[in-house]
Amino acid sequence: VTKRNVVLITYDSLRADHCGHWGYERETTPNIDAMAEEGVVFESATAPASRTNPSMAGTLTGEPMVARDRVANPEHARNHLERHGTLAERFSAEGYATGAFCPNAYASKYYGFDRGFDRFEDFMFDNSRYQDLFEEHLGDSGFYTLLRNLRNFVFRQEAFKTWDSYIDEMVEWARDQREPFFLWAFSLDTHFPHLTPRKYREWSNLFDQYYYNWRCNQLIDEFDIDISEEEIQNIIDIYDDSIRFGDVLIAELRDRLAEFDPVIVVHGDHGEAFDERGLYGHFYPSLYEENLHVPLVVDDGETSGTVDKPVSLVDLPEIVLRAANIENGTPEEISHDWVVATDYDGRNDRRLTAIRSRRFKYLVEAADNDERRELYDLDADGREIENLVGAHEASEPLEALVDRRITHEEELLSIRSATEELGAD
């Protein structure tokens, strides 16, 4: 069986319910929708966490990342990726050329995401001496963030780097490789700030982009935002335009790499909140559907279908390896009765755990000695408003599952701590 070339496209902050194939009324994702018509759609795909760093660490290893520290500490992701091994390392072991183009700082070399890649371009400081100097003296300061953002704006790097500024590099890299190859393309276009070129703007204008990105910047670290429905809709407008622009990346890669007949896999790394419960974006961890439910579509030119049972993005390595003819089986055979999501809010010492079945979601949020438990019927209450804990027969079995998961995480952290102490001795 011939090993297939693979292109993995990750969209930052892309909600499933803002994609056309999931029923969205706007034509935001014509290329993802075309893939969905031809390939395999996972309708209940769930991110393992609500922010890029823990979500992608879990996605690329096949194991949720468990940590009790701020995301800014790179050691947790580095250790997790090393401990569990990455999809790129697996491809490399199978004789693949591996390349990544990822302008997201939280999935960069600094956090260890270059493991297994022959080439990893994160568009950060090219000179490591300057990188080390900045981090050593300014790394925890607001001044460092300001300088980095100014540099990013001038050179179109990190948060300001759109896919059209590096697609030539991706295509050139793929053409230079001996087949087979694995290419990971990360698009920040769907992440705040939403800077969509004029020709792709359908629902916003230039003023909207500047003003409502400024408003987003005001709201992003607020826990209980004060904003009108009209402003939220305007923010959604610039978000949807950015999705429409980001979606074009698929068409470009399919067209320019057509001779290699690659398997194409598209997914969001997590979602985005729009004041469903007082939050904007994903600055604060949240395990509700707006932050966890993501698109996941596989087009291998051979299999098609819809999977409505839950999958987690931690299933992505197995899905991709099957589509590439490395593992036995087909992608659509992968599903579960339930999946888990976990995250940690280091600012407020909030521990979040969720169990999601096809119909129900059970959430636990704990901080200090305070704990809140919630159960939602996603079929009847997709916006997760009516808490059914204790009032529905699904409460007891899902409570047992989530408690087992919480116990597992605490045991894992205890073992890890004890191991580190032994190593220190």
What are these regions (language model features)?
Residues 1-425:
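Catalytic domains that recognize anionic headgroups
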